[in-house]
Protein backbone atom coordinates (compact mmCIF):
# COMPACT_ATOMS: atom_id res chain seq x y z
CA UNK A 1 0.00 0.00 0.00
CA UNK A 2 1.76 3.14 -1.22
CA UNK A 3 1.53 5.94 1.35
CA UNK A 4 3.01 9.31 0.32
CA UNK A 5 6.67 8.53 -0.36
CA UNK A 6 7.11 5.51 1.94
CA UNK A 7 6.78 1.81 1.13
CA UNK A 8 4.10 0.22 3.30
CA UNK A 9 4.93 -3.48 3.50
CA UNK A 10 2.54 -4.19 6.40
CA UNK A 11 -0.91 -3.35 4.98
CA UNK A 12 -0.07 -3.55 1.28
CA UNK A 13 2.58 -5.54 -0.56
CA UNK A 14 5.45 -3.09 -0.66
CA UNK A 15 4.58 -1.50 -3.98
CA UNK A 16 5.83 2.05 -4.51
UniProtKB/Swiss-Prot annotation:
GO MF annotation: an example: phospholipase A2 activity
EC number(s) from the headed UniProt entry: 3.1.1.4
Cellular compartment(s): Secreted
Function: PLA2 catalyzes the calcium-dependent hydrolysis of the 2-acyl groups in 3-sn-phosphoglycerides.
Source species of the chain: Opisthacanthus cayaporum
BP GO terms, sorted: lipid catabolic process
Record keywords, A-Z: Hydrolase, Lipid degradation, Lipid metabolism, Secreted
Catalytically driven reaction(s): a 1,2-diacyl-sn-glycero-3-phosphocholine + H2O = a 1-acyl-sn-glycero-3-phosphocholine + a fatty acid + H(+)
Tissue and organ expression note: Expressed by the venom gland.
GO cellular component: extracellular region
Protein name: Phospholipase A2 1
Main localisation: secreted
